[in-house]
A protein has these predicted regions:
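Extracytoplasmic low-complexity, Pro/Thr/Ser/Ala/Gly-rich segments
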Residues: 26-82, 249-252
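Catalytic zinc-binding patch centered on the HExxH motif and its immediate surroundings
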Residues: 27, 84-111
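Long amphipathic alpha-helical segments used for membrane anchoring, targeting, substrate engagement
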Residues: 1-37
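Short helix/loop segments within enzyme catalytic domains
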Residues: 49-71, 169-212
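Active-site recognition of the HExxH zinc-binding catalytic motif
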Residues: 62, 110, 128-145, 175, ...
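Pan-zinc metallopeptidase signature
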Residues: 207-258
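Post-HEXXH active-site segment of zinc metalloproteases
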Residues: 144-171
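Short pre-active-site segment immediately N-terminal to the catalytic Zn-binding motif
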Residues: 114-132, 162-166
Length: 258
């Protein structure tokens, strides 16, 4: 296992990078997902209900927002709960990977034990962290169905030396998309208490590469970052939160232009 708090924070680092972890770039045989879809029968425990509520709200947000920010109708995804390990379109995934998005079968996966430990360790803050994870993973789905992820992989292939830089930009954009969703929640006065927005920002910081390396006792080397620093992740979540506009999530500095 990964050891202490939030499963060592190492697992939370993995909530966003399934293709790298499982060696999938969207090619190869697709195995069926094994688990329970996040329908009514799956939303039983408190943490499951929190995730299911976030899934419903994030889905509705993108159904409304997608036609404005991108072209066409939002191609929805689904969330699969699993325990221990599961088979996905990206290969076999264990609980050590944590929550993730698979671009091949276009599904979001949540390990139930991970979510329960998140809540046990952090209480209400864990609830907000779980919602942040949902919004972030749905951001990866948006990147996938809009072709952003494909363009990033092409750029990484043409410029291997900048591969990590493009990975960071992809993750920061998903953080910004999550912030745009959180902005819609704030507009509807759906946060339970004033401190929840700050908790979301702290959740974004907690998965910064520098924080994760520091907690693991490893040297902090910005050149090795694949997700962004705590400051960057907070900054881009804040950008989405402040603007409420996914089109302002310009983390690539024009690199994705045709």
């Amino acid at each position: 296992g990964a050891g202490g708090g939030i499963i060592g924070l190492i697992v939370i680092a993995a909530i966003v990078i399934l293709p790298q972890l499982l060696g999938s770039s969207g090619d190869g045989d697709i195995d069926p997902a094994v688990g329970e879809s996040a329908g009514p029968t799956a939303c039983v425990t408190e943490i499951e209900q929190i995730v299911c509520g976030a899934v419903d709200d994030v889905s509705l947000y993108w159904e409304r927002q997608y036609p404005e920010s991108f072209q066409g109708t939002f191609p929805g995804t689904d969330t699969v709960f699993f325990a221990g390990a599961t088979q996905t379109g990206c290969g076999r995934a264990s609980a050590q990977i944590g929550p993730f998005y698979c671009p091949v079968d276009q599904l979001v996966y949540f390990d139930l034990d991970f979510l329960q430990q998140l809540q046990d360790e952090f209480g209400a803050t864990g609830d907000l962290a779980a919602q942040y994870i949902v919004a972030h993973e749905y951001g990866h789905h948006v990147q996938n169905v809009t072709g952003i992820s494909d363009r990033v992989r092409q750029l990484q292939g043409r410029a291997p030396g900048s591969a990590n830089e493009f990975s960071v930009a992809l993750e920061l954009q998903a953080d910004c998309f999550a912030g745009a969703w959180a902005s819609s929640v704030a507009e509807r006065d759906l946060f339970d208490r004033p401190g929840e927005i700050e908790e979301a920002l702290l959740a974004a910081e907690a998965v910064g590469d520098d924080r994760i390396l520091e907690s693991a006792g490893q040297e902090i080397d910005p050149e090795s970052f694949t997700h962004g620093s705590a400051e960057q992740r907070r900054q881009w979540f804040q950008t989405g939160l402040d603007t409420g506009d996914p089109e302002q999530c310009r983390t690539f500095n024009g690199a994705l232009a045709p």
